[in-house]
């Protein structure tokens, strides 16, 4: 399902690219990634994987990372808005769009609405990847498929506790709610246990605190020896995880891909924004990036600059419809 990547970018091309970027105030030899969740989560993996590819492919000399958990990504977002750090980008995904929806829908009371930040408060640089939703159970679980989970839930709704790597109303929660709704259950009755990123959610599953996890497929690729993937939200099986069954093939037509991308602080120059966006696009043509992409089963979805803004506006409408469908707003 993935396009074959192009020939390796020559060292000469990379040198020319770095030279062109160095003419901006963006320091092309380094980049700092702010991550709004804990270790082992989708944001964490996307930031570190992108930084790894950029350095190994020669686009950067160094990449540094800072996990700033809190408020479902809100703490990191506020940090970017209030401090406006240089040479720093924020990794974000669909939850940032959800913030925009909650600000304008009355989901947050009027007194606190002004405190709700969204993608409009930072500078969209580029969307880079898509990650399908995935549901997993422990290896020793009686659940071998999503149908098994649905049957257990219908027999006793409280017996199935679903973990996720963020707060209620986050993508992990919404994708899980969507899958249960497709199975004929009331999504608001599902017991959802929030954790600080996918790593802790996985620990909760393995300890028996929860029965299933709703998360991104990429977050599970490194833990496949510990868990059983019982359903993913892709339209077809994914080449990088061929043993993972889709919900669709099990009779539940739930399809969703969670985008992830990068944002700059308010006031970032247009020149810097375009330079970083170009770099994020060019690295996707390298074998270093392909190695990172394949091990995470990501989909390349490159939307730079204005295309990214257009995409965010469109998804705001789509996510508003989804949240209304699920009764969240």
Which stretches of residues belong to each language-model region?
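Hinge/capping helix and adjacent helix->loop/strand transition within the periplasmic-binding protein
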Residues: 28-30, 55-57, 79-88, 101-200, ...
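Hydrophobic/aromatic residues within well-ordered alpha-helical segments
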Residues: 46, 50, 171-175, 312-315
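N-terminal (or domain-start) structured segment
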Residues: 26-121, 168, 183-214, 219, ...
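C-terminal segment of classical bacterial N-terminal signal peptides
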Residues: 16-25
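An extracytoplasmic/periplasmic, membrane-proximal ligand-sensing/linker region
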Residues: 28, 270-329
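Bacterial N-terminal signal peptides that target proteins for export
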Residues: 1-12
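C-terminal lobe and pocket-closing loops
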Residues: 126, 215-285, 296, 314-317
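Short coil/turn segments
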Residues: 38-40, 94-95, 138-143, 165-170, ...
């Amino acid at each position: 399902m993935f396009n074959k990547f192009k020939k390796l970018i020559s060292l000469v091309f990379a040198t020319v690219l770095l030279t062109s970027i160095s003419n901006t105030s963006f320091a092309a030899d380094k980049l700092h990634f702010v991550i709004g969740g804990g270790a082992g989560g989708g944001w964490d993996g996307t930031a570190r994987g992108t930084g790894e590819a950029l350095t190994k492919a020669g686009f950067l000399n160094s990449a540094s990372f800072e996990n700033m958990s809190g408020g479902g990504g809100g703490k990191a977002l506020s940090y970017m808005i209030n401090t406006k750090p240089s040479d720093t980008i924020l990794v974000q995904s669909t939850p940032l769009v959800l913030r925009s929806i909650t600000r304008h829908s009355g989901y947050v009371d009027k007194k606190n609405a002004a405190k709700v930040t969204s993608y409009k408060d930072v500078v969209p640089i580029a969307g880079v990847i898509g990650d399908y939703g995935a549901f997993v159970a422990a290896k020793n679980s009686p659940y071998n498929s999503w149908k098994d989970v649905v049957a257990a839930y219908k027999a006793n709704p409280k017996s199935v506790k679903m973990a996720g790597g963020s707060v209620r109303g986050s993508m992990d929660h919404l994708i899980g709610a969507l899958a249960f709704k497709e199975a004929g259950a009331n999504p608001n009755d599902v017991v959802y246990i929030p954790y600080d990123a996918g790593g802790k959610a996985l620990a909760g599953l393995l300890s028996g605190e929860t029965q299933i996890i709703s998360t991104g497929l990429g977050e599970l690729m490194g833990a496949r020896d510990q868990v059983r993937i019982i359903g993913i939200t892709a339209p077809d099986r994914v080449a990088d995880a061929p043993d993972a069954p889709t919900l669709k093939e099990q009779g539940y037509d739930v399809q969703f891909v969670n985008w992830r991308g990068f944002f700059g602080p308010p006031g970032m120059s247009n020149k810097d924004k375009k330079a970083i966006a170009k770099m994020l696009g060019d690295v996707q043509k390298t074998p270093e990036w392909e190695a990172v992409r394949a091990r995470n089963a990501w989909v390349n979805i490159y939307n730079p600059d204005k295309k990214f803004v257009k995409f965010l506006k469109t998804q705001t409408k789509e996510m508003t419809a989804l949240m209304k469908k699920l009764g969240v707003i």
